[in-house]
């Protein structure tokens, strides 16, 4: 095991029609996640450089396909909350120096303002493109377990956002240990409360891919006033 995409592909082969990520009124199956992610990966495959691709997208199932699609493209992803104060977003982008920005339609205008010469892609359009399996296979052959998987920005003890880089290997070790301790199996259903750009959401994203279980994105109004 050297890549988190192996989890997705293995679970999809066993549970293709099972809902893996759910919202209040929407759900997406393992097969749908796989197909959408590969389409996104194909669109982003020609992005130049090795810098992460920034993601600005809402708290919804499509955002997770954006993350995985970036992984298929051979890049690390870096989620950014489009509702943060603009000066904090500017600091994150300046620190990250992304190779591209992938944004949903609600955040596309913001992404274009931030781009400053780098390509911007609309998530909804990328999900409708055609998969180039040969191109994705070539990218996968060149990936190794120590490749960066994601960069998540914390608030920072000084108040300045700081990016924390995690590799495929580190994430795989963590998730496997977590699942072992918590005794999670394919019959379980996780509840996601954390924003998808927070480190705490990592379990809710990757445990289902590893074990074939499901994760529900709980509406904020259910647990916040």
Give short role names for the model-derived ranges:
Residues 162-189, 199-225:
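Conserved AMP-binding/adenylation subdomain of ANL enzymes
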Residues 1-169, 182-183, 208, 212:
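Carrier-protein-dependent adenylate-forming modules in NRPS/ANL systems
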């Amino acid at each position: 095991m050297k890549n988190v995409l192996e989890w997705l592909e293995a679970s999809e082969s066993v549970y293709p029609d099972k809902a893996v990520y759910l919202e209040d009124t929407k759900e997406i199956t393992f097969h749908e996640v796989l197909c959408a992610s590969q389409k996104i990966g194909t669109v982003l495959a020609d992005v130049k450089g090795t810098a992460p691709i920034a993601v600005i997208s809402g708290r919804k199932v499509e955002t997770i396909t954006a993350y995985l699609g970036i992984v298929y493209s051979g890049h690390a992803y870096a989620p950014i909350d489009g509702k943060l104060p603009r000066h904090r977003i500017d600091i994150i982008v300046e620190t990250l120096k992304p190779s591209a920005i992938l944004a949903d339609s609600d955040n596309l205008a913001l992404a274009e303002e931030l781009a400053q010469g780098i390509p911007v892609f609309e998530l909804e359009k990328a999900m409708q493109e055609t998969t180039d399996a040969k191109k994705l296979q070539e990218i996968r052959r060149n990936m190794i377990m120590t490749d960066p998987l994601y960069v998540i920005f914390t608030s920072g003890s000084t108040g300045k956002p700081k990016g924390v880089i995690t590799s495929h290997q580190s994430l795989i070790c963590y998730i496997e240990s977590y699942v072992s301790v918590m005794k999670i199996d394919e019959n379980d259903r996780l509840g996601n409360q954390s924003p998808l750009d927070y480190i705490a959401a990592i379990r809710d994203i990757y445990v289902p891919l590893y074990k074939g279980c499901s994760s529900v994105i709980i509406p904020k109004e259910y647990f916040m006033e």
